Each structure stands twice: as structure tokens, then as C-alpha cells.
Amino acid sequence: MENPMVNYSKIIANTASNHYNVRDEYKNNTVEQNVAITMSEQRRFSVGCINITGELNIGMMIRSACLLGAENFYIFGRKKFDKRSTVGAEKYINIVQYNFDDPIHADESINERLEYLLKWNSVVLCEHGGTEIGSHKARLLYKEELENPLFIFGSESHGLPIAVAENPHFYKMSIPQRGVLRSFN
């Protein structure tokens, strides 16, 4: 008998063809039908990440964004991610990648891309020291100022680039950590 953990591409193909990560009521749908359902339930926000080093981490972020109803997922810096951790979510969310030859030293270029996205989005940096999500101030911002928010997360070890973190055109919010775990990783 073949070891099922050896042939990842076979496992991925089998999972996709059987809709294993699709809710039971949608398992008999085509992928196109499920895409249409997902698009009809999306909310007016996007999620992005900058210089995430773990390829599985990017995939898990894509899956989380998709489950929360994001329209888009932006990747700044990495050329690839491990699709195994998306468990099929990459089919149901628009993924935009901005690749840089040297992503670690592309801070100004990333900042310029985010400035460009201000035409369509309110850029919200998720970092320590910002307005706490759930606070009265955050509720007012979300209600009165934020249009199509693009929530940006920094790398696991370095956070957000300084050029991005200090940009006065971007909002800065904090999502307080709960429970006993140290991190998502």
C-alpha cells in the first residue's frame, strides 16, 4: 500500500476534486458555483502581508482571509507560498502578488504600492501600539472614515517595515492577543 504522506500533489488533487474543505451543503457544486457563492458573501475589505517568511503561514493567512469574507489578499515580497496550507481557499479569493528582487530591502517600494492602493482602500496597519480593535475610537474610525479597509500584517520576526509603519496616510490598529498562546506560528 502506498504511503499517503509521500505524494503531496496526489493528495492535493484528490482533496480539490472531492471538495474536502467545502461545507457539506456545497460539496455537490462545481468550483464555479462555489466561487459565485463565495463572491456573493464577500465583504468590502482586503488583507495583505509584507515579507512573511513562512510559506505555510501565507497560505494560512489566505485561508483565514477567505473564511472571514475578504475580497482580496495581497502578498508583498514573496514570490511563492505553499498552497497546501490554503486547503483550496486560493480558488475563492483574489490573490495579488507584488514581488521584489530583494524583498527585505524593498521597504520604500512596498510603501509606494500601498500609497497607490489608497485610491481604493483605507490602509490599516495591524501592529502593536495602534488604536485597539473594539475600542470606541476604533468603532468611530470604522464607521466614519475607513472605506474598503486593507488590513496589512508584517513579517513574523520584523513586523512592518519602518517606511510603512511611519506613513502618516495609513491607519494603525492593534488586535489584542487573547489566551495563553505566544503567537500564530
Named regions from a protein language model:
Residues M1-N185:
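Post-transcriptional modification and biogenesis factors for structured RNAs
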